[in-house]
From Swiss-Prot:
Activity regulation statement: Phosphorylation at Thr-172 is necessary for enzymatic activity.
Disulfide bonds listed in the record: none
Protein name listed in UniProt: Cyclin-dependent kinase 4
PROSITE patterns in the cross-refs: PROTEIN_KINASE_ATP, PROTEIN_KINASE_DOM, PROTEIN_KINASE_ST
Single biological process term from Gene Ontology: cell division
Reaction(s) the record says it catalyses: L-seryl-[protein] + ATP = O-phospho-L-seryl-[protein] + ADP + H(+); L-threonyl-[protein] + ATP = O-phospho-L-threonyl-[protein] + ADP + H(+)
């Protein structure tokens, strides 16, 4: 942490160590509020920070001005040299005590009420639509990157960090999960905002199942598990700019949604299939997903607090 940041923030607890660095819960000494500090190490060369990292930090500084109820607020970005070969980028976010993974793990049987899932998904897609309208592809959506406040407010985190994270990966031998990655990413094809909608579809199914939908242990295995459910795409749909041919996979037919997500209702099943469409061009957008009949009944009709009173926050507040 830079001298300026040390004078402004007081770390009080380590709350996570992952592929992309260490996250601390800290107190803002000026406001007294808690924040989340994320330290990311970036490899440098003889010319200093890679240009891609400089561009990404510039993007992050622009994101400081974002103000959306379903986006985690980025409050500050600071880069400071640690050695000739390494620079530490410190990101300061608003602090939220639990993520969706923790939240779902606390849900008692038989699972979340349908209205709660509608509420969570509507907020999730609203945040995602906002990112996409601002030309930001998240690339790494998963339950750990979706935060849920004790009052049930959903906030997307870790957006706009893809290039910085790719630099960090050279320094950290941690395997990043493949379970929420879109087929075009697994096939190393070109991709854009539809990759996030695929990930959102996987998370949508997980809200019903309370466990991941596709649990592959390699890119090929992940694709096999996907095709076991959605069926093997046609030759016409298979991307041309990939090294893995369609013939590498055995023929499969699409499974009924109620077979792999038996808890889902008819409208939810229709939306899920639209989100888990193989072709990115045919996959529903976040904006169109928000207009889907699944959300026709207002999820705010019931008291939001009633939905969330049975689920406490992931960690106790540090006094």
């Amino acid at each position: 942490m830079s001298k300026e940041m040390k004078g402004q923030y007081e770390p009080v607890a380590e709350i996570g160590v992952g592929a992309y660095g260490t996250v601390y819960k800290a107190r803002d000494l000026q406001s007294g509020k808690f924040v989340a500090l994320k330290n990311v190490r970036v490899q440098t060369n003889e010319n200093g920070l890679p240009l891609s990292t400089v561009r990404e930090v510039t993007l992050l500084k622009r994101l400081e001005h974002f103000d959306h109820p379903n986006i985690v607020k980025l409050m500050d970005v600071c880069a400071s040299a640690r050695t000739d070969r390494e620079t530490k980028v410190t990101l300061v976010f608003e602090h939220v005590d639990q993520d969706l993974k923790t939240y779902l793990s606390k849900v008692p049987p038989p699972g979340l009420p349908l209205e709660t899932i509608k509420d969570l998904m509507k907020q999730f897609l609203s945040g995602l639509e906002f990112l996409h309208l601002n030309c930001i592809v998240h690339r790494d959506l998963k339950p750990e990157n979706i935060l849920v406040t004790s009052g049930g407010q959903v906030k997307l985190a870790d957006f706009g960090l893809a290039r910085i994270y790719s630099c960090q990966m050279a320094l950290t031998p941690v395997v990043v999960t493949l379970w929420y990655r879109a087929p075009e990413v697994l096939l190393q094809s070109t991709y854009a905002t539809p990759v996030d909608v695929w990930s959102a579809g996987c998370i949508f199914a997980e809200m019903f199942k309370r466990k991941p939908l596709f649990c592959g242990n390699s890119e090929a295995d992940q694709l096999c598990k996907i095709f076991d459910i959605i069926g093997l795409p046609s030759e016409e749909e298979w991307p041309v700019d990939v090294t893995l041919p369609r013939s590498a996979f055995s023929p499969r037919t699409q499974q009924p949604v109620d077979k792999f997500v038996p808890e889902i209702d008819a409208m939810g099943a229709d939306l899920l299939l639209a989100m888990l469409t193989f072709s990115p061009q045919k996959r529903i957008s976040a904006s169109d997903a928000l207009l889907h009949p699944f959300f026709a009944d207002d999820p705010q009709a019931c008291s939001k607090q009633e939905h969330f009173t049975h689920i406490c926050t992931a960690t106790d507040e540090v006094k």
